[in-house]
Amino acid sequence: VRTVCLALPTNRECADTVTAVGAEAAHAARRFGVRVHLLVLDSADPAARARHAAAAAALPPVEGVVVHHLDEDAQRAFLRGAIERSGLPGPDRLLDLMLPDAVSYGACTNRAFLLAAALGCTSVHRRDSDSRYQWHDGAPVFPIEHELATIGLKAADAAAAVTEHTLDPAHADKPVALVGASFIGELSVDLGEIRELDPETYHDVVALWAPTGATEEERRELVAESFTGAGTEPFTADRAVLDRPDIWRIDMCNIALDHEVYERVPLPPATDTIGSDYFLHHLVHDATLPGVTHNRHIVNYYTPERRTGSGFTAYQERYAKFLLSMLYLHPVYADMERAGGALLDEHHHVRPEAIADSARRSAATDRAENHRRLAELDRCYRRLGGKYAEFADHLAPARARLLDEAQADIEDFALLIDAWGPLVRASRATPADRLPR
């Protein structure tokens, strides 16, 4: 029986999402005959955790579905064991990269990857706490329908399960490494208010994540494509395309990854940085691995804490760090694009050493572009006034720290890639009595 992991990392109250994802797990087990480990990785406050535990306990028992609700203590205990078994140097440093004190979108997904390895899963299917399913003909529109139909299959064999097949026949023997769709509803990054207040400033703020040297036309295209997902058009009928994955149309709240990818290269463990969990999108695409892009989009909505007070400040700082991370990630993306299929070995497996080397090289990139990004962000936010000008006041004394953190983040990524193979093997070797309950 194929074993898969349906993962829901959360740091906020989302009991309704736990219930909804539980229904998707039950659907997967019944429809595909798979064993589903439903993994709720919970970093929320104690009151929210208690509600999540109650929601998980209230899920109707379904044959083939195993529910794990793990707080940070349980996650830490698992990680300590895996790190210890790996024999890697610097165990405390590795634990910090895997479970930092701060928010890390990459690290929470990396924990799901290692737990999935421990539980014998062949794929990870990730959902998010601030999303819900569309409904059509009285039933929820579950993305796992497309994910389990194709993930991990040889592309030639997956062709029968999609509505369109445009993959170059040269890639027919490679496995489907990624299956995903996007979201409908609000922007995936909480900048919608800026877009409404001042579209010109919105353009300037979003264009800051363009690569160094991008033309004005390239920047305009980037702004038009960024953070909008699949717009607002609701689901009416299935469409699934087998090709290189359309990474602009796949969101981390709606994705399945094959273990042959995530067991070789982790996500960047950057803290307080939005978008740090999209690296494997680029890797799969650039390495010429097949993917399926479908249209079972999830509904994205916002929790109000991002828009006022300390929640607003924290979120805008994560956006600033996202912009700074691009100084180091764009050169890695460029290296991967140039390498193409050379990123794979003869078994169509990704070569992690090439990625680690590229990340290490990019850490030495001149910071001038990031100084410019921060100055431009300051100008834009002061132009908006109000709480945005107040955020600019908050950002000014933090500049040196943020610049240092962005460089340290890419260095940490290289270090984690080096450690990843031993960590995955150590996770697979977790004794039965130490597996997550």
What function would you assign to each model-found segment?
Residues 3-5, 37, 279:
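Cell-envelope/extracellular polymer assembly enzymes that use nucleotide-activated donors
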Residues 97, 121-138:
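Short beta-strand-to-loop acidic/aromatic patch adjacent to the donor-nucleotide binding site
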Residues 48-119:
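Active-site-proximal specificity loops/subdomain of glycosyltransferases
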Residues 127-128, 291-299:
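Catalytic beta-strand/loop signature of glycosyltransferases that borders the donor
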Residues 7-13, 20, 38-50, 55-56, ...:
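Terminal low-complexity segments of carbohydrate-biosynthetic enzymes
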Residues 133-258, 263:
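Conserved catalytic core of nucleotide-sugar-dependent glycosyltransferases
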